[in-house]
A protein has these predicted regions:
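Catalytic phosphate/metal-binding cores of nucleic-acid and nucleotide-processing enzymes, i.e., regions
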Residues: 1-140
Length: 140
């Protein structure tokens, strides 16, 4: 892992922590946020624990966040969080990797809202819109 990869991973981690801090505060308005949960795919594990996690069912590419609450014809919400990185002229938005696209496509076919977001603010907007307004799983 390069230094820039490590920085990007730590940024994504801090953004995800901020989403859960917001969710805890927003539970008065949206009690369903009690069930917002995360996969541990983004966690860097020592090799022994990584092997154990894989044996226990961790799957590469699985989205970072899951809210198992049906809304607007969807069975639930999945979110893949990506960091915003700085390019030469404007922020670059990382793309989904092959395994992440495969999960996204599968989940959409199965009736879930599955979106990619860049940073905590976008994740919070997606969750708020999903719980209150709607979700367009085919735009991201």
């Amino acid at each position: 892992m390069t230094v820039s990869d490590e920085i990007r991973a730590r940024y994504e981690e801090s953004e995800q922590v901020a989403v859960f801090e917001w969710a805890e505060l927003a539970r008065a308005e949206f009690p369903e946020l009690e069930y917002l949960n995360a996969s541990l795919n983004g966690v860097r594990l020592p090799i022994g624990l990584a092997v154990k996690a894989k044996r226990l069912g961790m799957r590469k590419g699985h989205p970072d966040l899951n809210l198992p609450v049906p809304r607007h014809g969807y069975h639930g919400l999945y979110i893949e969080m990506k960091p915003i990185t700085r390019g030469k002229k404007e922020p670059k938005k990382p793309r989904l990797e092959k395994d992440q696209r495969r999960w996204r496509d599968f989940l959409i076919i199965q009736g879930y809202c599955c979106l990619k977001c860049h940073g905590k603010d976008e994740a919070i907007n997606i969750i708020t819109n999903y719980l209150g307004g709607g979700c367009d799983a085919h735009t991201r």
